[in-house]
Amino acid sequence: MRMFIFFCNFAGDMGHVYHIPEQKEKETTVFYTTILKNMKVLVATEKPFAKVAVDGIKQVVEQAGYELVLLEKYTQKQQILEAVADVDALIIRSDNVDAEVLDAAKQLKIVVRAGAGYDNIDLAAATAHKVVAMNTPGQNSNAVAELALGMMVMAVRNLYNGTSGTELKGKKLGIHAYGNVGRNVARIAKGFGMEIYAYDAYCPDEVMLAEGVTPLHSAAELYAACNIVSLHIPATPETKASINKALLSQMPKGAVLVNTARKEVIHEDELIQFMQERQDFRYVTDVMPAADQKMRELFEERYFATPKKMGAQTAEANINAGIAAAKQIVDFLVNGNTKFQVNK
């Protein structure tokens, strides 16, 4: 008997292929379509998307025949626990999706972080719950890169106090992690006439060289060579607190560290100790340290942090990441595409 191959995304056994007798093909296809059409996609955002981004997400979701549910500006965890109870897909920004949230999401199949970083998702718990976790790499990389360059200008021109500063032209810029953001930083920095170096253990030298960037082969080598380092590493068990006094001590006089990555990668106690010893060093970031108040008091004219994460806070990045998240959800539910999956 000829068999009908049926790819099942909705049953929680993603990736399995089911064989259904020929005479069942028509009724099964109808059943499958009905299930897909009844799916719910929740957008849960403490910091909401721009309205134009929500409109774009809604269009993608509803064109696929799904229902869009919004939970915006929520203030209590209980609100998201209740909202995820009956949804099939979840879009978040910096919102935390931990084991408790996943426990409450009884029929959740996929969660997408609209942005590059995904340390706000408990990946092990997602895997345990058979939930696919994704990010949307590259969608906000230009926004983050532009902010990083703006922070460099702020630091070297002494906008803290309005005194005379220096120019970026001719300075040695080190890019720590040469991914989507790092590559955009390099592209923009070329326009300033900077000498550009990069260290990324996972990026071939040939890629950097083809883009006019000099590859270096250790973080210590990068920090020792450069006047300014732009930090773009993710927060992982290997990188947390890895930017420490020993590494920073390699940097030349008048050095600047720009962090638009994650605060967890900085060893805060050692950063403070280093800045107390090195009066020439400046630190600029869009991820406020836990010791922000202390650092403001100690280093008023050498330290700046934005009140909240600002790298992706542009209208363009907002729209790009939100719509990309919606498209990835539809592609996953319909076609089983796991291209941007970050858990195993």
Residue ranges and their predicted role:
Residues 44-48, 72, 94, 260, ...:
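Structural motif
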Residues 129-191, 206, 332, 337-343:
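Phosphate-binding beta-alpha-beta segment of Rossmann-like dinucleotide-binding domains, i.e.
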Residues 69, 88-165, 267:
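Phosphate/diphosphate ligand-binding glycine-rich loop within oxidoreductases
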Residues 99-102, 203-297, 313:
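Rossmann-like adenosine-cofactor binding region
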Residues 5-11, 18, 22, 28-87, ...:
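N-terminal glycine-/charge-rich "phosphate-binding" loop or analogous flexible N-terminal tail
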Residues 31-40, 45, 52-56, 63, ...:
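C-terminal helix-to-coil terminal segments
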Residues 38, 108, 169-172, 245, ...:
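Phosphate-coordination loops involved in phosphoryl transfer and adenosine-cofactor binding
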Residues 191-209:
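NAD(P)-binding Rossmann-fold cofactor-contacting core
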